[in-house]
């Protein structure tokens, strides 16, 4: 619960009052600790068994909070939802263009992938263009996500390394920028490294906050990660969805947003929620999940985004809450609702495959605040 604490915000977030970087300084205020609300309920025998608490913030490209559940200003670590914003310096600096990174490679910069062959090959390609190989990556190594996702042991004799890490695309991008800028590579994950200082400064601008107001922690891949109000995270993605029309990061946002929706298989992988949502979104939705119950979904046609935090990090509850928000906002048609129905996780099955309970969203979005 430590991450869900007070934070300084710019703007009060009320509908029509922007949270953006142009908000006057006198509107800075402190937000009280987050108020969580029940988002998803599990029932058994018709009786409530579990409640998953959390919060939702729906924000437009100007930073106005359009709708919410719980406290939209509650602070959460962003985890892998931050990757698209962490990739901005690579584009803003011209490094991506100088190295000739393809659209597919830009998509992998934003990925939490499965370590499938296409992911590994694309990470290798980014590194090769920077004149490096996987041995410089500082993300560490884990069993490829495809196997953990399916709850299966990897084949005997399978060799995996840093390229298979779900964050290898982000780290390959970090290395590429270091090479282009002439920065040292061996300590690129350190918070004081010029790369990470550039990332922090750019992320702060993208979400309309001051650097000193953004708490920092170290992510599972050893890179710095940042905590912020859900409304700020959603604001950054609403700007990403705005693309070329964004006045500060337009060209970079356009390239990243187009890459993510054109290559959702590279952003995630077989069987993953982000892949399912972006395919169902038909090029309009940008979706990114982060560890421990965080997700952001943005709509290009609306220049809006919503961020969700499930406080206990439960993934099935997160999926159910996301589908509910899509429905309540009217973003889905009947075909899309049918395509994503399995992600509601409505029936809870026992070891014999018999339905013994149900999981369902139990919240209604309220107006902006």
What are these regions (language model features)?
Residues 23-34, 102-213:
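Active-site-adjacent helix/loop patches that line small-molecule binding or acyl-intermediate pockets
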Residues 51-56, 172, 200, 292-295:
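Short glycine-rich loop/turn motifs
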Residues 23-73:
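Beta-lactamase-like hydrolase cores
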Residues 240-369:
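Structured C-terminal helix/loop/strand segments within mature extracytoplasmic catalytic/sensor domains
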């Amino acid at each position: 619960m430590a991450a869900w604490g007070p934070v300084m915000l710019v703007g009060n977030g009320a509908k029509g009052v922007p949270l953006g970087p142009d908000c006057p300084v006198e509107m800075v205020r402190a937000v009280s600790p987050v108020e969580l609300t029940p988002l998803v309920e599990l029932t058994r025998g018709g009786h409530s068994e579990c409640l998953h608490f959390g919060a939702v913030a729906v924000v437009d490209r100007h930073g106005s909070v359009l709708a919410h559940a719980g406290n939209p200003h509650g602070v959460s670590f962003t985890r892998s939802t931050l990757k698209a914003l962490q990739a901005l310096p690579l584009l803003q600096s011209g490094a991506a263009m100088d190295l000739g990174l393809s659209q597919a490679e830009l998509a992998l910069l934003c990925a939490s992938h499965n370590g499938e062959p296409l992911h590994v090959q694309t990470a290798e390609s980014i590194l090769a263009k920077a004149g490096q190989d996987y041995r410089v990556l500082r993300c560490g190594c884990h069993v490829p996500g495809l196997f953990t996702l399916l709850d299966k042991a990897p084949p005997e004799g399978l060799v995996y390394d840093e390229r298979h890490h779900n964050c290898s695309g982000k780290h390959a991008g970090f290395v590429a920028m270091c090479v282009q800028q002439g920065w040292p590579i061996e300590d690129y994950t350190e918070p004081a490294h010029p790369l990470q200082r550039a990332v922090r400064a750019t992320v702060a601008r993208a979400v309309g906050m001051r650097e000193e107001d953004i708490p920092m922690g170290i992510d599972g891949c050893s890179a710095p990660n940042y905590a912020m109000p859900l409304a700020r995270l959603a604001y950054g993605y609403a700007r990403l969805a705005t693309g070329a029309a964004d006045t500060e990061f337009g060209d970079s946002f356009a390239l990243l947003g187009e890459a993510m929706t054109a290559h959702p298989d590279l952003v995630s992988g077989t069987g993953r929620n982000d892949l399912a949502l972006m395919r169902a979104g038909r090029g309009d939705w940008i979706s990114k999940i982060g560890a421990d119950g965080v997700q952001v979904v943005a709509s290009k046609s609306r220049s809006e985004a919503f961020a969700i935090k499930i406080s206990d990090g439960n993934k099935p509850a997160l999926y159910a809450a996301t589908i509910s928000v899509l429905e309540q906002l009217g973003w889905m048609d009947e075909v899309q609702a049918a395509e994503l129905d399995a992600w509601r996780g409505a029936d809870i099955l026992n070891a014999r495959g018999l339905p013994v309970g149900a999981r369902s969203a139990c919240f209604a979005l309220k107006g902006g605040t």
